[in-house]
From Swiss-Prot:
EC numbers on record: 2.4.2.29
Organism from which the protein derives: Vibrio campbellii (strain ATCC BAA-1116)
Annotated protein name in UniProt: Queuine tRNA-ribosyltransferase
Pathway per the UniProt entry: tRNA modification; tRNA-queuosine biosynthesis
Gene label: tgt
Transmembrane intervals: none
GO biological process, alphabetically ordered: queuosine biosynthetic process; tRNA wobble guanine modification; tRNA-guanine transglycosylation
Names of the cofactor(s): Zn(2+)
Subunit structure: Homodimer. Within each dimer, one monomer is responsible for RNA recognition and catalysis, while the other monomer binds to the replacement base PreQ1.
Broad class of enzyme this protein falls into: transferase
This protein's GO CC annotations: cytosol
Domain of life according to the entry: Bacteria
Active site positions, chain numbering: 91 (proton acceptor), 266 (nucleophile)
Length: 378
């Protein structure tokens, strides 16, 4: 089913909306937990839903390698396979291929690489990506693109962006040929170069997509460049389509993305950091392994309503971390995912109440920091 996007309110550049799918609604700005292999690591779908998540991200590349398309089709689709019946967005596999480094060779046709699972020679292109994502039953399908590395010269970024545009057209054509009833998002590329981003946006909007992602950021570039590119890019994207910042990020990055007009985010940070004992709280980050928490009988965050904070102390979580107990990673993950969803809930409430600027100020004050200036203010 084609999504509908209802842009309900704006407060400055911050946008408050609702995405409606056949499988449910998603309030925006939204954060999508990452379920790389058909699971948010260590969590049941019910637990993930209990944190407030309304949409998940699945990984086309990894699910293609394991368990494969045939197993997926035996179950129906990814929703049935993992027992998550809300909306799912799947990335196209482009970033994972980019991450393989020397193990892959990129050509106009697509990407040749060796499987990180068993070393087999594999080829992926725009058409294959569209076919896999249709079999996954993805509510939002991402085009196949090349993630421009950082650093890249203007000429390197230009060639990469132009090839991604050609792949975008191929993705659109094959998506339509497959008669996929769901939604296809374009991905803006162009590195840190504003003129290349302009060309990418123009090409993508001429092709026409159900939503637009900003890709090729959070790949090593300075934060100032990411903010500058977002400020330049977002105003040029269609007002009535959702905007998705891929692979971002820290709580501060989510706030800064919303300040610049982003509606959707995903990142492994809350789950990966949880497994490493780095826990997000109102004032910043707690490293639960540190010795000072051994005798601290207070909850992680007195403002948090998650299962972990309602039932366990820092002392207990410290003990689990020191003993490498699986329960520790699970409780940490529940907390971090709930922190991210509470952050998004607070952002949405602030936009609804026309007090987003005040929210941003308070957010940074609790961290003992100044609000970063917008690029146009510098």
């Amino acid at each position: 089913m084609k999504l509908s996007f209802d842009l309900k309110k704006k407060n400055g550049n911050a946008r408050r909306g609702q995405l409606t799918f056949e499988r449910g609604t998603v309030q925006t700005p939204a954060f999508m937990p990452v379920g790389t292999y058909g699971t948010v690591k260590g969590m049941t779908p019910e637990e993930v839903k209990g944190t407030g998540a309304e949409i998940l991200l699945g990984n086309t590349f990894h699910l293609w390698l394991r368990p494969g398309q045939e197993v997926m089709k035996m179950h129906g689709d990814l929703h049935d396979f993992m027992n998550w019946h809300g909306p799912i967005l799947t990335d196209s596999g482009g970033f994972q291929v980019f991450s393989l480094g020397k193990m892959r060779k990129i050509t106009e046709k697509g990407v040749h690489f060796r499987s990180p699972v068993n070393g087999d020679k594999i080829f992926m292109d725009a058409e294959k990506s569209m076919e896999i994502q249709k079999d996954l039953g993805s509510d939002i399908v991402m085009i196949f693109d090349e993630c421009t590395p950082y650093p890249a010269t203007h000429n390197e970024a230009k060639k990469s962006m132009e090839m991604s545009l050609r792949w975008a057209q191929r993705s659109r054509d094959h998506f339509d040929k497959l008669e996929n009833p769901n939604n296809l998002f374009g991905i803006v590329q162009g590195g840190v170069y504003e003129d290349l981003r302009d060309v990418s946006i123009k090409g993508l909007t001429e092709i026409g997509f159900d939503g637009y992602a900003v890709g090729g950021l959070a790949v090593g570039e300075p934060k100032e460049d990411m903010h500058r590119i977002l400020e330049h890019t977002c105003p040029q994207l269609p007002e009535d389509k959702p905007r998705y910042l891929m692979g971002v990020g820290k709580p501060e990055d989510l706030v800064e993305g919303v300040r610049r007009g982003i509606d959707m985010f995903d990142c492994v940070m809350p789950t990966r950091n949880a497994r490493n004992g780095h826990l997000f709280v109102t004032g910043g980050v707690i490293k639960i392994r540190n010795a000072k928490h051994k005798t601290d009988t207070t909850p992680l965050d007195p403002h948090c309503d998650c299962y972990t904070c309602q039932h366990y102390s820092k002392s207990y979580l410290h003990h689990l971390e020191r003993c490498n107990e699986i329960l520790g990673a699970r409780l940490n993950t529940i907390h971090n995912l709930r922190y991210y969803q509470r952050l998004m809930e607070s952002i949405r409430k602030a936009i609804d109440e026309d007090r987003f600027d005040e929210f941003v100020t308070e957010f940074y004050e609790r961290r003992g920091r100044e609000v970063p200036p917008l690029a146009k203010e510098q």
